[in-house]
Amino acid sequence: MIISQALKQPFFTEMRTNQQLGYIVWSSNLNRDENHYLYFAIQSGEYSADELNHRADEFIKTCPSLLKAMSADMFEQLRESAIEKLEQKPKSISERSIKLTTLIFEHNAEFDRDEKTISAIRNVEKNELAETLEKILGEDSHRMVNCLMFADGHSNTAGLASTFEDVRDWKKSRIYK
């Protein structure tokens, strides 16, 4: 949670404000099947998907140093923000249902997960997170899924090959458990 929050604004600032790559620029995180994912997205009318991918990759390489360079005050603000988010009670029956469903099916009915996460957040140090991020994004260990979509007006300058031609056929070939 802290890593995702720490990278949101710098990614937006660099990709949208500084490089002016596109109007839609965002990043987020997701936990699924005990895996933690970071998402980075850019939609552009001016730049092709392979160029956006290259620019995002260059930014992602700088993430550990961004975290290391963060001030202690900023890190504490991110820590408190993450804790506050976890302490928020669901505001509707729908939100509560989604939260319970996630706890049951994604986290083996670990109903005290938020409390454990809050405890871990309180005890983690900035340098620990930076080192973890460095390991995760290292050349030998990083795992990425890149979804590149080319608009009709954009050419595939890198000559990237598509892994499928028809989305419907591709979806039929997926096995979901």
Regions found by a protein language model. Name each.
Residues 23, 38, 145-147:
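A broad, low-specificity signal marking well-ordered, structured residues that form hydrophobic/aromatic
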Residues 22-28:
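A short linear hydrophobic-aromatic micro-motif
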Residues 27, 42, 149-151:
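Hydrophobic side chains in beta-strands
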Residues 1-17, 41, 164-177:
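His/Glu-based metal-binding/catalytic segments typifying zinc-dependent metallopeptidases
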Residues 6, 10, 14, 30-93, ...:
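M16/insulysin-pitrilysin zinc metalloprotease superfamily fold
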